[in-house]
Amino acid sequence: MSKFSFFNYRINMRNSHATLGSLPCFIKFNYLSSSSHSKFYSTSTDSPMGHIVSASKSSWYNYYSHKNYDPLTRESFHDELRGFISLYKKQFKEEKFFFMAKIKFNNNDIRSISTVQIGSTDPLEVLRLLEAITSTYMHTHTGISEAVSEPFEYELFSLGDGLPKGNIIFTFKPTSNPSIKTKYEHKSNIKRNKNINLSKKNPLNKFKYNGYTIPNTMDLSQWPNIHFINDGKNAVSLNNIIKSGVDNMTLSFFITINKKYNEITVLLNNTPIFKIKDEKIMSEDDLSSFKRTITENEQDKVYVFENGEMVFFSENVKTSFIKKITRQDLINFENPKIITLDLETRSVPIHPIKEGKDGKEGKVDSIMFPILMSVYNGKFVKSFLFSQSAWETEMMNAFKSIMLRKYDGYKVYTHNFSYFDGIFIIDILSRLGEVKPFMRNGKILKLTFNFTLPNSKRKYTLYFMDSLLILPDSLDKLSNFFNNKVKKLFFPHSFLDDNTIPINYVGKCPDYKYFPKAYTEDFTIEQYQEYANKFKNNNWDLKKELIKYCEIDTIALYQVLVSFQRKIYEKFMIDCTKYPTIPSLAFAIFRKKYLVEDMIPNIKSKLHNIIKLSYFGGICELYKPFGVNIKSYDVNSLYPFAMKYFKMPSGIPKYVKGTLQNIVRFTDSICEVPFGFYNVKVKTPLNLDKPFLPTRLNTPAGTRTAFPLGQWEGWYFSEEILNAMKHGYEFEFIEGYLFEESSMFDEYIDLLYNIKKNSPKESPWYYISKLLMNSLYGRFGLNPEGEEIFITSEEEGDAIIATKEYVTITPLSSGNVLISAKLPEEAFGDMNISVPISSAIAAYSRIHMSHFLTKYSNNIYYIDTDGIKVDIDLDKDEVDSKELGKMKYEYVFEEYTSLGPKVYGGLLYDKKGKLIELVKLRGYSSKLPYNKLKEGLVKDHTLELTQKKWKRKLSESTVYLKNTHLLFL
């Protein structure tokens, strides 16, 4: 159940801008947070005993804890693991097993909290298994909270310590394979080399490079074993013995002496390994203050010493660059090789109803199954009806209709394949051939299906794609945008879900209330009456109308895709069907038409993970909960504005460490803060009315972005630091990464913005240009960590688990298993990503919004990424609906109420002069009366809302419907 306390949280955090000392007890800053970890051994004398059931048709099983833990601690896992081992020994003879830990939260969501481990019943191995499954998550609460879907919508966490509530599940499979070994059986005694050091006789030998100690002075008389030669023009330091394991080696220095600098060649056992250049930075007599440049493999590292202490360090980060696309795509528009597919489902009640802990939360009352599948190839449409009891077999037969030689290489599009249709389809396809999903963040972006035909060994391929990922709007809207000849129909879905009505129903047209958009402007009573008049003779046929509706969907989607494909190709010479998402398509267009070579660095995972700490979303804050005559303004294309008018990070990154003064001094910068990203200690001015610099907080519901007062440490973009300095923020610089500055998006944005500005709002190009403009920036910030997905047999799955690390497994209802294995870093080094670009664009956007936040501080009620609500007219020079970055006036609320970010509403006049209500409530899809929202302003008032939500379950190839309760306090 979602809880939202406006008075206890929002007023304190958003309006009073709590300092660190006054923050609620459950909120801790990342760098200050600490937790007392539970002891390794449980103090419990009684081991819990859950129960074991088969997980699927495979040999995998699930152990379910009987106890619901509040909270789940390390001891909880220890106790349940003991109970599991005890039960396992009674039921299975195999000593070893594959093992994965999960949590079933109180909303019935299930999340894996470990990868697949290989365990055994040996007592020591059990303790090691416990360490493996709890070390990551019990020590960092955010790890668990981030594994929870929509954590803010459910009361999953105990507010006291941030640990989750719920039951424990162990998914496991016994194995007697002698080649399967636990992680600890693989370990052998490894000889450890001692650190490589020079003799410690000289107290100045403090500086180390790659384990080699080098004197941190230009006073050569302090170097070990020094000898001057060639009348003092050169010096040598020979045969300095160092130790490495049992063997001794010698380190030597050959030095060329100049008036202002020394050049040094370093040799290990008489083999040159790197070069040094020491340069004086103070007076000629000051030999303890100097700049040292070490060159190895054509890479330089710079160290600066003052009075013998290192005060600055820098080095270039090895990097490649994002490359242009040079290939030419060819499309035969007479045969674009596209198939469209649509499923219709029917929900049936579950008896007994699956309920949450309190009888309400997470309540699951029905399950969906496919009842119809329609397929369209551009010429013909076929439909297949399914029965509830045999839909899997019937769907297999339906798919055989497109498993044909002539469809080899075709793209099969379904609108919402990733989150809905694919749940039913994936396991079915795995029974017919080889299935290779491409997934990111749990979302199926593309599915490759290889199959063979009878009496043939040749493999054929179909690619299943999600059209919603490339055209993210309803099919109804898309049909209008692209001026389809065939438009989406209306259908009474609620009537279909009434299980008292047979599928062969023929009779009166279903009532208006059964249609999903009833009582809205999208489907008026007049439109319904026009539809119902077609069936005056009570000849409305459920089966016939369902088939017609589904077939029209496939035809409408096909027409949209072909139109989109043609328009993109004619403008950019790119085949859009090669790209699974709209960001990937926008990125391809940019790389093909506008990218300059050797400009944008391809940032790998280690540096990505650091700079990503500076990547925040927009400012979203509530300041005043109620007002009258409140005007709403939105920035015209905020992110494209930032991309066009501001410099972006480019070139080779340079790591720097030191104070800001030394960073400026030793990089020869003319900037107050050199361009790049910095790890800094932040101190806010305590009198700042509306803070705007973000940071991340660990809360019981996971990591959250906040804009507080106080002190903390974090990574930020240089331009955001400069903007904050103007308003009194203070920064202590620790380290950073410097970049060159480049303009790179001007032409891309100019082209698309001009298209948008000159196109009618309901035209295809208005929609396309807006989509491409706003979709590019996020593509640069993709997570570089990849995963490889396998859907295979149990036997092959066991082999994969035994040979790969970081594996998770999902047994499927067919008996096959879905395995996800994290790819090693070197396997995804060419993903063409550059998170500095995304971070900079987001920062520039916050800087732009901070201008309005500070200028209209006394008048602002609410800010949300690219929009504000104020009780004053903005200056005229700041408002222009046609110019990038300017504000555009939306409407005025006669009366306005907000309960928090993404939760607001009010009364306003429409274009016809009629007073209407507008309410926006994150996470709630139904219509909420404004008066209900307004009741949330009353202290101690409780507002409870209920709506149905899908719960996808890939392991069962189904989707559940559950009642979700949102509670506003």
Curated annotation (Swiss-Prot):
GO terms for biological process?
DNA replication
Reactions catalysed according to its record: DNA(n) + a 2'-deoxyribonucleoside 5'-triphosphate = DNA(n+1) + diphosphate
Location in or out of the cell: Mitochondrion
EC number(s) of the enzyme?
Answer: 2.7.7.7
Q: What class of enzyme is it?
A: transferase
Keyword entries, A-Z: DNA replication, DNA-binding, DNA-directed DNA polymerase, Mitochondrion, Nucleotidyltransferase, Plasmid, Transferase
Got a GO cellular component term for this one?
Answer: mitochondrion
Question: Which molecular function term from Gene Ontology is one that the record holds?
Answer: DNA-directed DNA polymerase activity
Query: One short Pfam family name for this protein?
Result: DNA_pol_B_2
InterPro entries reported in the protein's UniProt record: DNA-dir_DNA_pol_B (IPR006172), DNA-dir_DNA_pol_B_CS (IPR017964), DNA-dir_DNA_pol_B_mt/vir (IPR004868), DNA-dir_DNA_pol_B_mt_lin_plsmd (IPR015833), DNA/RNA_pol_sf (IPR043502), DNA_pol_palm_dom_sf (IPR023211), RNaseH-like_sf (IPR012337), RNaseH_sf (IPR036397)
The family annotation for this protein states: Belongs to the DNA polymerase type-B family.
Extra remark beyond the main annotation: This DNA polymerase requires a protein as a primer.
Q: Protein name, please?
A: Probable DNA polymerase
The beginning of the lineage is: Eukaryota, Fungi, Dikarya, Ascomycota, Pezizomycotina
